[in-house]
Amino acid sequence: MGSIKGRFAVFANFDYRAGAPPAVSFGNRGGCPTIKQRAQSFVSEFQFGGEFVWWPSPELIAKSNLQQFINKHGLGSYDELMTRSTTDIAWFWNSVLQDLDIQFHKPYSRVVDLSKGKPWAKWCADGQMNIVHNMLDKYAGTPTDNNPAIKSETENGTVSLLTYKELREQVDRMANSLRSLGLGKGHAIGVFMPMVPEIVVAMLAIIKIGAIFLPLFSGFGAAAIASRLNDADAKALFTAAGTYRRGKFCAMKLIADEAAAQIPTLQHVVVLNQASEWLIEDLRRDAKPPATLSGPFDDSPTERTSAEDPMMIIYTSGTTGRPKGAVHTHCGFPIKSAQDMWQGLDLHADETLFWMTDMGWMMGPWEVFGTLLLGATMMLYDGAPDFPEPDRVWSLVDRHKVTALGVSPTLIRALRRYGDEIVHRHDLSSLRKFASTGEPWNPEPWTWLFQNVGRGKLPIINYSGGTEISGGILMGNVLTPMKPCAFSGPLPGMAADVVDENGNSVRGQVGELVIREPWIGMTRGFWKDPDRYIQTYWSRFPDVWVHGDWAAVDNDGLWYILGRSDDTIKVAGKRVGPAEVESVLVAHSQVSEAAAVGIPDPIKGEALVCFCVLKKDVNGDPSLATELKASVARDLGKALAPKEIIFVGDIPKTRNAKVMRRIVRAAYLGEKLGDTSALENPASLDDIKRAAG
């Protein structure tokens, strides 16, 4: 398949209700979005058809899970699969459930029930199924039982391994203990722990007894924990004595205790102490002192639950008001996770997946559900990715023979500054693929990962979706050739589209990313807040999910995400997405990371202020700032030249490496920061505040 060099002149001053899209160009930067100004009318020339840089081999295609699914179901091509999977959703998701060997206590009577409308689709109607049965119980007595389920390493170098059998035994014991405390079906139980094997034990024990798992970001403060657990009327909380970050002990139990005092419904705290022993604290009046976990080692029966019983609530960060709790069921999030891993990432049972994440973000539960449903191995790491040496990630891949490495663009930008030598000192031959999520790519770090780490041989499977999606809307795969920064397209079963302000499909221009049909992983709504769910996703076009991302499709059918539609900056009437500005900045040889925000300007309406992290041993000075301003003006047009370039030591990010532009802007303007509970590196705000004076 060759590249197509078609060009389309498109005016950029659309009037979208949620703000007009940024103007972009594909092709000159290897398929990644950039912006060009065309004379005074600000016409953007869309150049589609960047060069393909990776092609799958015939052997890889033949062995791939996706091709085998196509063959098994008598489909003539990938395109035929995409058409049928989005027009006959009952057939597709029934096929996925069967091919993944999802076992039900009671079979479902219908795959999907749309009687209450698309926003309230119900799946596996009348079926009974507890997902833990399919993750652990069904492997008992099979060869999978002796395979590794979890490999793990902590920052101090402690390494451990649990087989499927060992994990099941630990989950059974914990489930027995929880039942002895009176906990069971429908009770909400929070988990505030580091990424160690015990967090998986806690998660699966909660789900096994029919309770509701509430994952919490390990960097939360007491107020953030309390607000979420109060919203869910939580009965219990798992926590740990603490964890280490960059060699420093971070106490978690003290934070949990402070939160527990603010949660009237909380009755028990289950603590993993520094000796890796479980202690149970009873918070009720006249309770006994903490006791060690005393559940019997006997098998624990898995609770028979409805396939649509709530199984997990993941709270997404907001700026005001009560937190949004996305509700997920036994037949929802786990199935979507496994499908994405199986058909998109092409993960096989003999593989080890390592994704740098936290259980408080959707990629944590996603990794657990997907790997165990596929009979594969997850790799957990609790620690900083560049401590005690900047090669920590590459050493983990080497030591644990990781085959699929999940990263974020921010992580790669940070690691790239240390150079190539630290990568090449390790044996990375076990790697078969990369995967990436969290934010749009810039071309330079994508190319560095592809060429310098993957040596131009390994695909980078781009992945974009969200917590309420249960995984991906768009994803790469191993059937289609790849361009830098692009997606192969929507995942099978995801009826995604790019639309204009009237909801009409568009190609050759930027539009809103939408989904036209329900899918099995779709959140069942926000906990105790159905109106907010409808307003957030379903209120703009009838029966259409509007995701809040700018997207585009090129002439070769590859898709691109250009950032959040509510991040758009408008300078003197000209609209630009922060990712486009940041791509120009990180293309400079001395810049590692960048964040662009718009601030009020009395003349232009908004002005660009850009924050840059420089590479190692580079000192920022006025001449470099001037050079960077000139680069943006040259690439994007003089009207979009930044008002200021500010050099900082770090940029505020979440644990899953999303840049928190809202907080960057608020800190610079001296405004209230709002919800900062998801912030991984609060010290990064100091440089921004100092720059603001």
Q: Where are the regions a protein language model picked out?
A:
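Conserved pre-ATP/AMP-binding loop-to-beta segment of ANL
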Residues: 146-148, 271, 284-287, 292-315, ...
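Structural core segment of the AMP-binding/adenylate-forming
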Residues: 204, 208-290, 408
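Conserved AMP-binding/adenylation subdomain of ANL enzymes
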Residues: 334-352, 362-404, 418
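Conserved AMP-binding/adenylate-forming
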Residues: 381, 398, 432-434, 440-558, ...
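Conserved AMP-binding/adenylate-forming core of the ANL superfamily
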Residues: 80-84, 132, 146, 150-204, ...
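AMP-dependent adenylate-forming
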Residues: 66-67, 71-73, 135-163, 273, ...
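Adenylate-forming
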Residues: 194, 236-255, 276, 382-386, ...
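AMP-binding/adenylate-forming catalytic core of the ANL superfamily
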Residues: 216-242, 398, 405, 517-519, ...
